[in-house]
Amino acid sequence: AFPVGKVEFMEMHPMSFSEFLKAEGASNYDAYLGGLDQIEAVPDFFHVRLVEHLRRYFACGGMPEALGRWIETGDIAQVDKVLSDLLDSYERDFAKHGGRAQFAKLSQIWNSISTQLARENKKFVWGAVREGARAREYEDALEWLADAGLITSVRLNTGGGIPLSAYDDLKAFKVYCLDVGLLRRMARLDASAFAISDAIFSEFKGSFAENYVLQALLPQLDAAPRYWTNE
């Protein structure tokens, strides 16, 4: 029997940008950000350097081994090797769950994430998973990936009233990867892309930035995240 009331659960997330700053020896910048108590323009001196760190965070992500390899070597090729190994491990793990048919569905959804986010309309489209795919065929696999913590499904909210759930569009949602570094590697996007001015905010039509914001918010949220559109 499960020991009800005797087990404490803890959710694990990728390392945050704050932890990345500390790992890079930039605790002063982390302290500066932590001291902000209102929305205000960041002085150019801090802004330029924070964006430099953010570019590296987008490239490496927050998976502990990948971040550790970056701190140890400063070699993005070694970081890419770690990220590729992680992605390969996930795929191999899919094979253990539900037989060949379920493995195919898990892999197809997982490998479609970067393509889905690169679309002009970033709403999740089942047909982008496999031509002719329907929700009823793949919903169980999508739920498995979410329960495993590999993806986050974010519902479209059409209202803004209370409760938010009353205004959810149950047919429209976006799917994000657990980590921006894994997303970059999954998309086979070279880290040098983020060396270009503002590329971190524009690649994948801004979805890398969206994925980062969600990744930063999730450890702080006590409710399911939503998105809205003005279209």
Regions found by a protein language model. Name each.
Residues 67-231:
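Accessory nucleic acid-recognition modules appended to NTPase machines
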Residues 2-118:
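Interdomain motor-coupling "hinge/lid" segment immediately C-terminal to the ATP-binding subdomain
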